[in-house]
Curated annotation (Swiss-Prot):
One of its GO terms (molecular function) is retinol binding. This is Beta-lactoglobulin-3. The lineage of its organism: Eukaryota, Metazoa, Chordata, Craniata, Vertebrata. PROSITE patterns: LIPOCALIN. It comes from the Eukaryota. The gene is LGB3. It comes from Felis catus (Cat). Lactoglobulin is the primary component of whey, it binds retinol and is probably involved in the transport of that molecule. Its main location: secreted. Keywords: Disulfide bond, Milk protein, Retinol-binding, Secreted, Transport. InterPro entries: Blactoglobulin, Calycin, Lipocalin, Lipocalin_CS, Lipocln_cytosolic_FA-bd_dom. Monomer.
Amino acid sequence: ATVPLTMDGLDLQKVAGTWHSMAMAASDISLLDSEYAPLRVYVQELRPTPRDNLEIILRKWEQKRCVQKKILAQKTELPAEFKISYLDENELIVLDTDYENYLFFCLENADAPGQNLVCQCLTRTLKADNEVMEKFDRALQTLPVDVRLFFDPTQVAEQCRI
């Protein structure tokens, strides 16, 4: 992974529950630049499984309608890193979380590190928090790839709701 692991440990039970995609960033704008872009997904819920994997419930636009998807993130030896199978992305790395307000994560293709990197800022409420957004921006600056923040789902009417 090109994404530095900054989390010492991740308490999966504490990340459980409802989340909202508050901001998105990517190394390649085309991954997110339209409502049908492949990695423009809206996280809804994180559900830890009994085997310490993480089930991610998300929504995205497909064929002019909003659909719900479920992705299984499988644990690795590293507490904040998971293997996933979603398009070409096969790694999910939790950058930072305080469990109660925010969680930052990135998706990466481990076979082509640094080429396609998409990161999201999740929050527990839909209220935009400048402090959290600044923290997310700082977290993005620690990445070895130039990742630009350019999409704020809260400002966009097309946010996918079911």
